[in-house]
Regions:
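ATP-dependent carboxylate-amine ligase catalytic core
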Residues: 3-10, 24, 32, 49-56, ...
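Glycine-rich, highly charged phosphate/nucleotide-binding loops
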Residues: 55-72, 93-94
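Short internal beta-strands
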Residues: 37-45, 109-112
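Walker A (P-loop) phosphate-binding motif
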Residues: 135-181
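Extreme N-terminal, non-catalytic leader segments
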Residues: 87-91, 97-149
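Flexible, glycine/proline-enriched loop segments at strand-loop-helix junctions
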Residues: 107-112, 151-159, 198-199
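Redox-cofactor binding/interface segments in oxidoreductases and associated redox assembly factors
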Residues: 80-84
Length: 200
């Protein structure tokens, strides 16, 4: 796994043909809750519009462009795969876009099961689902943690676990409580910039 050392990213979000749909939850989550800047969204079916025109409830705005060349004019540091496409593998056109981005020195960030680092050897790729090699075995040490812990779980994907957790955290902070979001899902890790999304 190669991961850029820059503490802050400026994202171009690749969501071709899907940005306005629920399946683009990684794109939506990063825009709504992420700390990093959004340079633009790439979806040629909505090119010329803005995020606020299409999904005003996300609370942040960015231009929507149709091509990588247009995206590069907004000086992104990273290109995010903004959804998991049906079938779990990226279409060839997306791979071509990612290759061109990598060749331009743009970091690729992906939460897919499909590992992208082997596809782009020597290029900056953050495969979010690639677990770090130093995860210890369960020891029970967590039972001794002083602060209260709220665990959110669900029986399926894309049902609101992350959204509920982040809204609870937001409300708690609004009441002056000290809170920390510990991400475990791929979108959560991208939003928080750390954690573990180790689902193989």
């Amino acid at each position: 796994m190669i991961r850029a050392e820059a503490p802050e990213r400026r994202y171009a979000i690749l969501a071709e043909g899907w940005f306005a749909r629920n399946h683009a939850k990684t794109a939506h989550g990063l825009i709504r809750y992420g700390r990093d800047e959004i340079a633009c969204v790439m979806d040629s079916t909505l090119a010329g519009k803005r995020v606020s025109d299409v999904l005003p409830d996300l609370g942040r705005d960015a231009p929507i462009v149709g091509t990588l060349d247009e995206a590069l004019t907004f000086s992104p540091t990273s290109i995010l795969v903004g959804l998991a496409p049906p079938g779990g593998r990226l279409p060839e056109e997306w791979m071509e876009t990612l290759k061109a981005a990598a060749d331009a020195g743009i970091e690729i960030v992906s939460g897919l099961h499909q590992r992208l680092a082997p596809e782009f050897p020597g290029k900056p790729v953050w495969d979010v689902r690639e677990p770090p090699g130093d995860i210890p075995l369960f020891s029970g040490e967590g039972f001794g943690v002083g602060p209260k812990v709220a665990l959110t779980v669900g029986t399926d994907s894309a049902i609101g676990k992350m959204t509920a957790t982040l809204e609870i955290e937001r409300a708690a902070r609004g009441q002056g409580l000290s809170t920390e979001f510990v991400p475990t899902g791929q979108t959560d890790v991208i939003i928080g910039g750390g954690g573990s999304a180790s689902t193989p």
